[in-house]
Every structure is written in C-alpha cells, then in structure tokens.
Amino acid sequence: VEKAAELGGKVVAMCDSNGYIYDPEGIKLDIVKDIKEVKRGRIKEYADRVEGATYTEGKGIWNIKCDIYLPCATQNELDLDAVKILIANGCKYVAEGANMPTTREATDYLMANGVTFMPGKAANAGGVATSALEMCQNSARLSWTAEEVDTKLHQIMVDIFNKVDDA
C-alpha cells in the first residue's frame, strides 16, 4: 500500500481476515498503521475513525471498482466468480502479493479477458530482492540510503518485468 501510494496510486480498499474497508478518498496509511501495528486492532476500526469510510464484514472486496487489484493475503482468495466481478467492474491489472491467491481457473480467465496478470513469483520478487540487497550491505559492511536501495530494487523489478513480459 505504501509503495502504491508513493508511486501515485490511490488505494481505496483494504481487507483483513474479517472484512474490508472502503475509503473513496483514499486509504490513510498512517491511520491503518496505528490501528494494525500500534493498537493491534482490526481493520474495521478505520471506518469508525475516518468520515466517509465504510466497513463490510466478510469477503467481497472485489465488488469495489478498481483499475488494479492486489490480492495479498489468502491462498485461492480469487476464484472464477470473483475475477468475473473484478472484470465487470473495470479491473485491468492483477498483481499477486501472496502465495497463490488466484486459482488456476481464475488466472486463465483473467488472461483470456485481457487483464494483465502478474504472478506472485514475479510480483513478490521485490521483497526477496530487498532481503538480498540487505544481505549484500551486511556482508560488505555497507550502508545504503533508502533511495539507493529503492533505485537498485527498481532496476531489479524492471528486469523481472521485462523477462515476464517476454515469456
């Protein structure tokens, strides 16, 4: 969410295992971090704190109109029925942020219907690459700035994208 916002994206929905929040003005990450990291609360508290935000219990976050959908939690959370709703709502890109959150049937349907699909093995590579960059720093006793790490990570992700796009 943080990287999406940093790159100019407007994240309007987010879920946990109990339900999802929707904020048409864009999720306020500082409030989510306070709820989840500081208070160890549930995401539904966001709707109590932010005017105009709503909370919906249970599944169904894919019912919200979006350009990009990032399934980042549960294995097989995106099935055929869910991706049909996403496509009907205008989704053009799905990038997995979890281990196999999209069923094979749903993946095939996304690609057959012109949705750009980034599998988790490629999309999650940023976390693995960042860990590798940290290991390089530690072994060489270097200290890169966050901007230097981000620049190196950006090039790694561009290379991965090009390889996936060529496949």
Q: Where are the regions a protein language model picked out?
A:
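Glycine-rich phosphate/diphosphate-binding loop of Rossmann-like nucleotide-binding domains
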Residues: 1-65
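Beta-loop-alpha module in the N-terminal Rossmann-like domain of NAD(P)-dependent dehydrogenases
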Residues: 73-81, 101-104
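Structural beta-strand/beta-sheet cores of well-ordered domains, especially the beta-sheet scaffolds
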Residues: 7-12, 66-68, 93, 113-115
